[in-house]
Amino acid sequence: MSQEFDYIIIGAGSAGNVLATRLTEDADVSVLLLEAGGPDYRFDFRTQMPAALAFPLQGRRYNWAYETDPEPYMNNRRMECGRGKGLGGSSLINGMCYIRGNALDFDGWAKEPGLEDWSYLDCLPYFRKAETRDIGPNDYHGGDGPVSVTTPKAGNNPLFHAMVEAGVQAGYPRTEDLNGYQQEGFGPMDRTVTPEGRRAATGRGYLDQARGRPNLTIVTHALSDRILFSGKRAIGVSYLVGNGDNPVTAHARREVLVCSGAIASPQLLQRSGVGPAALLRDLDIPVVHDLPGVGANLQDHLELYLQYACKQPVSIYPATKWWNQPAIGAQWLFLGKGLGASNQFEAGGFIRTREAFEWPNIQFHFLPVAINYNGSKGVQEHGFQAHMGSMRSPSRGRIHLKSRDPRQHPSILFNYMSHEQDWQEFRDGIRLTREIMNQPALDPYRGRELSPGVNVQSDAELDEFIRNHAETAFHPSCSCKMGSDDMAVVDGQGRVHGMEGLRVVDASIMPLIITGNLNATTIMMAEKIADRIRGRQPLPRSTAKYYVAGDAPVRGKPVRA
């Protein structure tokens, strides 16, 4: 069986669904969208209810559930590396935090030769194009894009307000919009949730516009085995359907667009013969193109929680009890409101821990309950927690193919915490978080410190806690980086160096990880490259102002030292 299309997109995730939707706006263009997972079932509360965000990480229906190799600086732990599977990709299972990164992240990208048009003011129009913010558009936010963004509302949990106020009392700025003029500081956090209280994954936002188009073919349960080449030109894809072993071939008249994410995109390229030649030869894979950067430069965000008991019964601890969940579910299902309609990450912040950082190097997410991100080990009392993590670790990892079997997971190593800077940032971060939590705004609520615990104070004690308890924020990226140096995989339009008709468009092409969650930026990148693929003029540069700290101190005088 063989089919022919103008474009074949491999992976219906945050980037692939954007490309599929935008490319098929041109009626004379045909697109095949291949997704290894299944549909994004709208009746499955696990992926549709924002408060149920821990559920899709459990099991393998929606999660590839990768694991790292033993991480040498983390007590040789094999660490989780969850990635989304199904229409929507990781936007179907993520925490729904709508954070774009710092303006200076993109200005930093634009300093690289060939990436000059990735500055913040070049990217901002595409962030706006993708977004519909529920309180309306402005210079920073869109009003008619496919991604629904919900802002925190008056009357939400008092712990959110107390935690933001504590950050301000600790001497840090207040910001009304973490995606607006100033990211630095503490404030409300937007979320990718529809006005009806449903998860706003890219299957809902983008694909729902495009599903009925005759020029779009979507195949689920289609695991791409390898890209097919004629010389150095990509001409198609061989893929497996369901549990079958008989490959199906599809041909691409124009381009193959790899949108499989930071783990699977380099894995697919390597399996197809594009990657480090020595690795490919070891696996008896014919080398189509020796490209040493494929799978290198792997980056992620690591985070840990500081947990506190809550003296007042205002946390969402009761919602973790099964006997309260039917009422919460019914309110969400029928009214689109209540606890179920929020991811419960409604406040957060970004700070600089030292003057050496030009823009924030630590991110906070505040949660009005004390529980693990994956829903396990909930503290059996009212509590709250701060998720704290460093943003631009100097540690670099890699993805290596283990075999030619498309169903075998690759070897993944992030080399977490492999630099002294990592340890310094996490020690600073824990100590500064404790200072924030000790401010008067939290006096009515703050009970004892549950984790790490007051007995964990010295550098050595903190380091041991970090080694044992830090975990991924699920932000793998940069493993097929954009650029022009010897380790770059793609150019500024996602075109694979040395190849024709082949692009990578997803979080793997970020040259450096951004300051914040990745989903919004991945969508923006796909919007931007979609215009390039279609031969359209880029959107005009924004003229919006944005904050640069310059000589501003990292913090003012705290209320309580």
Swiss-Prot record:
SUPFAM superfamilies, per the entry: FAD-linked reductases, C-terminal domain, FAD/NAD(P)-binding domain
Positions annotated to bind FAD: 6-35
A cellular component annotation (GO) from this entry: membrane
KW Oxidoreductase (keyword) present: yes
Biological pathway: Amine and polyamine biosynthesis; betaine biosynthesis via choline pathway; betaine aldehyde from choline (cytochrome c reductase route): step 1/1
Gene designation: betA
GO biological process, any: glycine betaine biosynthetic process from choline
EC nos: 1.1.99.1, 1.2.1.8
Membership in a protein family: Belongs to the GMC oxidoreductase family.
Keywords of this entry: FAD, Flavoprotein, NAD, Oxidoreductase
Signal peptide: none
Name of the molecule in the record: Oxygen-dependent choline dehydrogenase
Reported cofactor(s): FAD
UniProt-recorded Gene Ontology molecular function terms: betaine-aldehyde dehydrogenase (NAD+) activity; choline dehydrogenase activity; flavin adenine dinucleotide binding
InterPro entries in the cross-refs: BetA, FAD/NAD-bd_sf, GMC_OxRdtase, GMC_OxRdtase_N, GMC_OxRtase_C
Function: Involved in the biosynthesis of the osmoprotectant glycine betaine. Catalyzes the oxidation of choline to betaine aldehyde and betaine aldehyde to glycine betaine at the same rate.
HAMAP family noted in UniProt: Choline_dehydrogen (MF_00750)
Catalytically driven reaction(s): choline + A = betaine aldehyde + AH2; betaine aldehyde + NAD(+) + H2O = glycine betaine + NADH + 2 H(+)
Pfam family, one: GMC_oxred_C
Catalytic residues, chain numbering: H475 (proton acceptor)
